[in-house]
Swiss-Prot record:
It comes from Drosophila melanogaster (Fruit fly). Belongs to the NipSnap family. It holds the Pfam family NIPSNAP. SUPFAM superfamilies: Dimeric alpha+beta barrel. It comes from the Eukaryota. GO terms for cellular component: mitochondrial outer membrane; mitochondrion. One of its GO terms (biological process) is mitochondrion organization. This is Protein NipSnap.
Amino acid sequence: MLKLRNLLAVGKSNNNAVRSLSTTPSRNDSESWFSKLLVRKIEPTKESHSRMLSDKEIIYALHTHNVRPDSMGSYLNNYKTTVALINEKKANLSCELVASWTVQVGDMDQCLHLWKYTGGFEKIDQAKEDLWNDPEYLSLMQERSKFLRSRHLQYLLAFSYWPQIASRTGKNIYEMRSYRLTPGTMIEWGNNWARAINYRKHNNEAFAGFFSQIGRLYNVHHIWCYKSLQDRKETREAAWRSPGWDECVAYTVPLIREMHCRVLAPTEFSPSQ
């Protein structure tokens, strides 16, 4: 009886050893995959994240206007006149319109306007003061309020590793992919996308990349330019076929709390078409 018990104990020990050996590679693979889902610790720094990721002397203002459905034409005419007025004062205001869009897929009856200020927040303060003392500008704002349901403003900084913003010509559509990140992960996002952006340059689709400075914080906006929705599909599929792109995505997905995309069409007065 004792010998039988000993044999069973040895057999159980051997089975455990075999089971352990047979599952080790699977566990290692699982741990390797799972490690990509963990947010890595970023070492403390005495520099602000914005200073490490961007040129703080160039600030972008993203105006989001939700327009009454029956007033889109009147609204666009009003804003076109406003842009012309500001262009006349461009030298004093140190600002210029980069692009202007209407939303085609996503938040309908919505318009986005991207302005660039050179000289930091000092120039923004100066421009606001000058415009608020301009009767024509105030009249246009008052008229525009009749066409709006709501509006929102964010001040943004451009990621330094993205290509320089260049106006596009011809017929294009744009996609704005907006992300709300977990607080404290902006540097890790930047480190990963500094590599990932190299996989998205083959079709010249990268238009602009921003993160929020004032307004909704821990917001990131990536703006892509395509010839059509079909061109978008083919360009994105080509990126997924590039070795390394999937790994970049795997590291950035855990940093995201929320994301959404909008397909945009440039307005007739947008500098970038």
